[in-house]
Amino acid sequence: MNDVVLSRRQLLALAAASLIPDAATADLYDEYINSTSKQPVVAFLARKGVPGHAFVGIGVRLEAGLTVYERFFGYYPAASGTASEVKLVFGKVSGALDYKWKDTAWDEAYVVQVDDARKASAIAVADKWKGADPKYNLFASGGKNCSTFASEVAAAVGLKAPSGAGSMLPASYIEKLKKANGAP
C-alpha cells in the first residue's frame, strides 16, 4: 500500500510541476492505476550539446499508448567546481547515479519494450553502479561516464550495444544504439 501511495505522490508531483490542470492530473493518475496492461519499457535518452547527457528511463507503457516513467537514472560527476571539472577530463572523479529534474527532457530517445526479467536486469545495473562507484571520467579514460552507463544497461536488456560508448557524445551514442538494433 505504501508503494502505491508513494507512486501516487511522485506522479502527482511530476504532473503539478508540468503545469497539467487538476482534472488532467487526476485523469493521468487514474489512467495509470486502472490500466489493465502495463508493458515494461526501458528508454535510452540523451540531451544534445557538449558534453550532453545520456540517461535511462524505466517505466511502463499503458494500453492507451501513454508511457509512464517510474525511474530515471543518470551518471553524473559527484562534485562540481573548476577543480572537479578539470579532473573529470584528465583523470577520474567520484560519480553518482542520480536523477535530476532536467532528466525529464531529452533530444534523442530509443524506447524498448521488455519483459519483467529484462526490466529487473536494467534496475540491477543501476543498483550495481550505486553500490560501487566505477569512477567518472568524461572520456571514459580509465573511468566511466553517462554513455557507458547507458551502454551497460542496453547490454543487460539484450540489445546490441555499440563499442566506444564512453568516447562518443551521448546523443550520438543513442543514435548508434538505435541503428545497431534496427530502429529508424
What are these regions (language model features)?
Residues 44-45, 106-114, 133-141:
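Second-shell loop/turn segments in exported
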Residues 114-126:
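A structural motif
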